[in-house]
């Protein structure tokens, strides 16, 4: 007889988001039937997202057994992100195990407070438009990290994240990401973590762009430190607006002989909403082409 057992483990949230033109939206709070309401400051000035749920699911292969990872972002009736739940499911023997963590989002006057199950509290200070200018994140042990954010503002007064800078307890700058929007079809991304530097270009095809009406960030952005620490804020549009188009290719500057390129292929439903993204990392090693693939399925409603 097959047994199902659920195991809940408290884990520190670390994200999965973003070609910086691609973010989804922070939204205003009001009553709904799911208990997702939080106080709403200045609802007319804050960005919103037009969905109640954005969920990502993928199967991650491992040497032991495949793991199904699910990331669920819930929005209230006014379109503001209220919670994130991350879950990993796997079968060992005849037993089903689930590792789950939940992160909540609370809105106050010019603030968004994000708290995970490990009691890490990230407090974002918001400007009058609802976008974060600073963040202070403190874990249960009392360790503190601070972040500053700057944006490109377009002619429609929309904000797109241009820079995130992280400082540690001692005030030392530890990491940053800078996005250059000079060419919206070829975003230049500069990343530095401690002494490591990495530059890349995120592109979308000229004349064959895919409209990002799904308002989702590109997969690589929320994998990229320090933005990986802010995936909930990214999906809540606390860190900026979505792009008009989906990124389809990421090319590192340092690919050299490896010719490394990541290609993103999207499947859309009849509304034009993304239902899946297939990512292929292709590079040359010892004269042979090697591929790493991942497929993420989306439920957006």
Protein language model regions, located:
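Buried hydrophobic residues that stabilize the cores of well-folded domains
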Residues: 32-301
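Hydrophobic helical h-region of N-terminal Sec-dependent signal peptides
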Residues: 18-22
């Amino acid at each position: 007889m097959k047994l199902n057992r659920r195991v809940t483990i408290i884990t520190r949230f670390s994200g999965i988001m973003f070609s910086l033109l691609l973010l989804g939206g922070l939204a205003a709070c009001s009553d709904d039937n799911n208990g997702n309401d939080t106080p709403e400051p200045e609802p007319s000035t804050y960005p919103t997202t037009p969905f109640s749920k954005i969920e990502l699911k993928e199967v991650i292969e491992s040497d032991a057994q495949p793991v199904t990872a699910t990331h669920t972002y819930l929005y209230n009736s006014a379109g503001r992100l209220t919670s994130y739940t991350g879950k990993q499911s796997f079968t060992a023997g005849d037993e089903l195990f689930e590792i789950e963590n939940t992160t909540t989002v609370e809105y106050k006057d010019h603030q968004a407070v994000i708290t995970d199950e490990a009691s890490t509290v990230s407090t974002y200070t918001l400007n009058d438009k609802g976008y974060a200018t600073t963040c202070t994140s403190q874990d249960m042990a009392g360790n503190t990290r601070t972040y500053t954010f700057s944006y490109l503002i377009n002619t429609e007064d929309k904000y797109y994240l241009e820079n995130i800078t992280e400082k540690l307890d001692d005030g030392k700058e530890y990491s940053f990401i800078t996005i250059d929007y000079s060419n919206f079809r070829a975003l230049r991304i500069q990343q530095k973590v401690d002494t490591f530097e990495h530059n890349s270009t995120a592109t979308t095809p000229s004349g064959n762009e895919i409209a990002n009406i799904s308002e989702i960030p590109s997969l690589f952005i929320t994998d990229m430190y320090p933005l990986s620490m802010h995936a909930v804020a990214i999906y809540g549009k606390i860190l900026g607006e979505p792009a008009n188009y989906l990124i389809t290719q990421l090319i590192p500057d340092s690919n050299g002989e490896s010719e490394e390129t990541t290609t993103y292929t999207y499947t859309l439903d009849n509304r034009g909403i993304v239902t899946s993204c297939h990512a292929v990392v292709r590079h040359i090693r010892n004269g042979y082409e090697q591929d790493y693939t991942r497929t993420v399925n989306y439920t957006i409603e």
